[in-house]
């Protein structure tokens, strides 16, 4: 591989903020459309100890000759007290602890204090417990507040009786020192009063913005680092650097959002606010790089393909792992994680990332595929076989050879590039060697599952139409079955009624026949009896005196 001048390498490292990668073959991967968009360091963090910051909300003015009456300061004091009164009352309600010496009743007092929270999450209850604990150390806090009340220094470290270091921050005093103190003896009191009033009004606006959510319940809503930045003003970097005792970039830590603050108590007498800042413990993994990869489509025999690589990998000790960083905090130059999320990658992908391009796996792309270009480090990477690449300055059309996977366009080739309807201003020079001995014609194209959006949509539409037809047929047959079932039920009922009718009629006929037979027998007997009575000699003659013929 072509070696770069040491000065160029130094400038490149300073520009990106990271060291060049060895395990991953970045130059070779450019041939197949894999671009390293960002390289970050890997940081681990865990919950650390808490630091306390005392914010002095009222500035100290230098002594005057007695002729100046700064009315704006009194108005600011009244307005600030009105603003903080809901916070003070809420904190007092939550931190109320029963005055007793027994352990059981002390615990019950904390429970009573927490009962003011209502329905709260575990994190909110933890925050409230922190306020209760801070209230138990109220004497030390008051001593700390008193010790910084008379100072004009914007940042001063004070050690209380328990040797707990806290930082006294006077954000507004920092502004007063810069704008007021140096000229208060040489200008009129009215002008300074107006200037002080404008500064105080601006700070009140910022305070209202910061504590907008905390007015309802400050213990349950932590202050973000953005709110702390507004609250502490220009003193925040000094506070953070004094607390962390680390070489990490302060802006990087602030952008992570891992530093949070919580209001612990407010002193109405001194207008001072005690804020607990939760500072995690950070550890950097030496030699580890988290690399973001962008895979754009490449050209293979006039067919559009895309290589199968992870979106983010971890390079450590000359090894490569998949590193999604789903549970991590990603900043411009670092990845903050609680644990290592690395996982093994297939051997073919490993060899591909190491520069063995014949081991790379490609998937054909059919239809529209939006990832045809990428803009990284001031250089444009594009598949100009599937995309119209036009240079506006100097005007020409960028052509791409059939054996090349992508085109790399830097400021030497074009300063303003047009990709279809997109316009890009190219600002950097491509300072790596573009390997041209690999031909996409010999690439290992594996037809995994082609990403054919148009065909897939058509297939889905056909499936939906077929499903609708089947549903219509199903409804028709269901209606038919429902009608047939009704007819069958009616026929069965009619048949049963007919059978019952026939049985009843048969029984009636049998009964009538039996009744008629009995009537005939009765009539025959009655006629015989009547004849005997009328002709007794006949029966006596024929039956020898037995009128019934009985011997």
From Swiss-Prot:
What's its membrane topology? Single-pass type I membrane protein; Single-pass membrane protein
Q: Which GO terms are recorded in the biological process aspect for this UniProt protein?
A: fusion of virus membrane with host plasma membrane; symbiont entry into host cell
Note the InterPro entries from the entry: Fusion_F0_Paramyxovir
* Stretches the record annotates as Fusion peptide: 107-131
Q: Which residues lie on this side of the membrane: Extracellular?
A: 24-492
Q: Where in the cell is it found?
A: Virion membrane; Host cell membrane
Question: What is the protein's name according to its record?
Answer: Fusion glycoprotein F0
| Species whose genome carries this gene | Human parainfluenza 2 virus (strain Toshiba)
Q: Tell me the lineage of the source organism.
A: Viruses, Riboviria, Orthornavirae, Negarnaviricota, Haploviricotina
Q: Supply the gene name.
A: F
């Amino acid at each position: 591989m072509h070696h770069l001048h040491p000065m160029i390498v130094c400038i490149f490292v300073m520009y990106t903020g990271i060291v060049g990668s060895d395990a991953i073959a970045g130059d070779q991967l450019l041939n197949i459309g894999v671009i390293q968009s960002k390289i970050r360091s890997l940081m681990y963090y865990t919950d650390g100890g808490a630091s306390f910051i005392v914010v002095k909300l009222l500035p100290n003015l230098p002594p005057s000759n007695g002729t100046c009456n700064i009315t704006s300061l009194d108005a600011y004091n009244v307005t600030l007290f009105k603003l903080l009164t809901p916070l003070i009352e809420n904190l007092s309600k939550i931190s109320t602890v029963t005055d007793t010496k027994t352990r059981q009743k002390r615990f019950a007092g904390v429970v009573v204090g927490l009962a003011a929270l209502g329905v709260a999450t575990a994190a909110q209850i933890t925050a409230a417990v922190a306020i209760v604990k801070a209230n138990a150390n109220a004497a030390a806090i008051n001593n700390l507040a008193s010790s910084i009340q008379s100072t004009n220094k914007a940042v001063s470290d004070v050690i209380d009786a328990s040797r707990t270091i806290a930082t006294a921050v006077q954000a507004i005093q920092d502004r007063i020192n810069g704008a007021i103190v140096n000229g208060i003896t040489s200008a009129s009191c009215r002008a300074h009063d107006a200037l002080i009033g404008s500064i105080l009004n601006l700070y009140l606006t910022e305070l209202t913005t910061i504590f907008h959510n905390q007015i309802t319940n400050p213990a349950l809503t932590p202050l973000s680092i953005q709110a702390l930045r507004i609250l502490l003003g220009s003193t925040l970097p000094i506070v953070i650097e004094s607390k962390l005792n680390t070489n990490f970039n302060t802006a990087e830590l602030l952008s992570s959002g891992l530093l949070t603050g919580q209001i612990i108590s407010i002193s109405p007498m001194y207008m001072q606010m005690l804020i607990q800042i939760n500072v995690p413990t950070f550890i950097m993994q030496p030699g580890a790089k988290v690399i973001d990869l962008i895979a754009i489509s490449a050209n293979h025999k006039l067919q559009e393909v895309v290589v199968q690589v992870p979106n983010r990998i971890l390079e450590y000790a000359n090894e490569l792992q998949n590193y999604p960083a789903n549970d991590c905090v990603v900043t411009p130059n670092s990845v903050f994680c609680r644990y290592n999320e690395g996982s093994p990658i297939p051997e073919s992908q490993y060899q591909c990332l190491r520069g063995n391009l014949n081991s790379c796996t490609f998937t054909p792309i059919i239809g529209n595929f939006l990832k045809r270009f990428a803009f990284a480090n001031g250089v444009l990477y594009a598949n100009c076989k599937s995309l119209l690449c036009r240079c506006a300055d100097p005007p020409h059309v960028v052509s791409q050879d059939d054996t090349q996977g992508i085109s790399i366009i830097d400021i030497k080739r074009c300063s303003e590039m047009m990709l279809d309807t997109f316009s890009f201003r190219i600002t950097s020079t491509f300072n790596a060697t573009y390997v041209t001995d690999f031909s996409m014609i010999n690439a290992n194209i594996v037809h995994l599952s082609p990403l054919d959006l148009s065909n897939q949509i058509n297939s889905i539409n056909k499936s939906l139409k077929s499903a609708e037809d089947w549903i219509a047929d199903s409804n028709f047959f269901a209606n038919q079955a429902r009608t047939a079932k009704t007819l069958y039920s009616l026929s069965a009922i009619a048949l049963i009624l007919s059978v019952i009718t026939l049985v009843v009629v048969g029984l009636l006929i049998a009964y009538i026949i039996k009744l008629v037979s009995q009537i005939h027998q009765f009539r025959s007997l009655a006629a015989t009896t009547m004849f005997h009575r009328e002709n007794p000699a006949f029966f006596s003659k024929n039956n020898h005196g037995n009128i019934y013929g009985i011997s």
